[in-house]
Amino acid sequence: DGLAHPFGSQDIIRRMTDLIAKRVCQAVRKASRTGEIRDKIRHALLDLYPTTQEVVDRVASEAAQKPGVPAVRHVVVPYDFDGALNGKKTGRPVPSTKGRALNWGINYLDPRTEVVGFYDAESRPHKDVLLYVGYRRMMDPEKSRVLQGPVFQVRNFYQMTPFCRIAALYQAVAHDWYLPWLFRTLPFVGGTNVFIAHDLLREVGGWDCHVLTEDLEFGTRAYLLRGAWPEYLPYSSSEQTPPTFKAFFRQRLRWGTGHLQVVDKVLTYKDVERSAQRRLRLSLIIKGQLEWVLYQLATFVPPIAMVLHHQDLMDATLVPAAGQWMLSGFSAIYLGFTFYAFRRYSAHLDNSCCPNSWLGRFCVYMGLFLLPLAAFMFPVPYTSALVLKSMGKEPKAWVKTPRTEETRAVS
């Protein structure tokens, strides 16, 4: 007997909803006429979607009020800082580089610091990486002075052009599978997902603020001066890849030019065993200039063969049928592997930017079929660095890589 009639309850709820909606609409119309709503929305957006700097400042202020909580510091590099470790202010503007900023930040480290981790602003490290770093530091502090992990630059996958998507996938494959082997021949250090002993940073003089690849330069210098060879860190971090070919080319051109700078610098260190310098320089040349040229030459083989065949200058029957089937099979394997890489690293993608329509998702998959053209373009920035350096026109200024906007979380 005490139960209300369902239709009566629904009618009450409907009337209440209409009443509330009308009052809200009236308030919004009134506020829009007076301009009051503009300020309210602006303040609401600033509170809901803070910038990275605002979040850091907020966390730093909260941590400062709690005893026993790790300190958070947010520092700005002075415009006139000379860039050297323990350097000085010159009173005049100094070009900005990543190495310069890192050296300024080292000054704010707690003297008790044993190891320093480096990440980019948009990095998302593995949640267990610090546990592993601490474990290695306790088990073998000498061999774990430099720990370098893989970086999967695929998170803004859906915001990239098709070429950059393919490049990002194969960059992730290289870091995932090839990086452990690379450590057998090169003391490779990347600029992110790397942990370096604090005392080693001080002993070798911090980061070089003049070369374009301060990370690779640090790895070679730490090895030659202190015998510190990087160890593979089996925990990945996800980041972004430049979304357009222009930005991609500029970043890779900087990497290639920086590599050439390191090759030239390796022999300039004093009080270092000359044989070690020569061996390291040879390894850098093999992994750099030689591989770039061979890869670029290999990309010319298919188009040259097509032109020769079209001009009746090459007989296709010279290749046995089994060989032709094998070549066709390789093409299918490469395309299949590209789709496998897409699925393998899908957990690291920002899926909030994935197209909602089936047509949009279909276009993403179809873009992966541009692999043959993309593969031709992969080595172009590096061979361009070779050509420009030979002409004395290589880039000399460090340029920050543009980032794409990511989904913002409510703080």
Residue spans for each PLM region:
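Short beta-strand-to-loop acidic/aromatic patch adjacent to the donor-nucleotide binding site
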Residues: 112-124
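Catalytic donor-sugar/metal-binding loop of nucleotide-sugar-dependent glycosyltransferases
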Residues: 220-237
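Active-site-proximal specificity loops/subdomain of glycosyltransferases
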Residues: 5-23, 27-31, 35-37, 41, ...
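A short, conserved beta-strand element in the Rossmann-like catalytic core
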Residues: 124-125, 217, 238-239
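Active-site donor/metal-binding and catalytic loop motifs
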Residues: 233-247
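Long helical/loop segments within the catalytic core of UDP-sugar-dependent glycosyltransferases
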Residues: 64-109, 113, 127, 133-212, ...
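Juxtamembrane C-terminal module of membrane proteins
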Residues: 21-22, 268-281, 311-411
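Juxtamembrane "helix exit" motif at the C-terminal ends of alpha-helical transmembrane segments
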Residues: 296-320
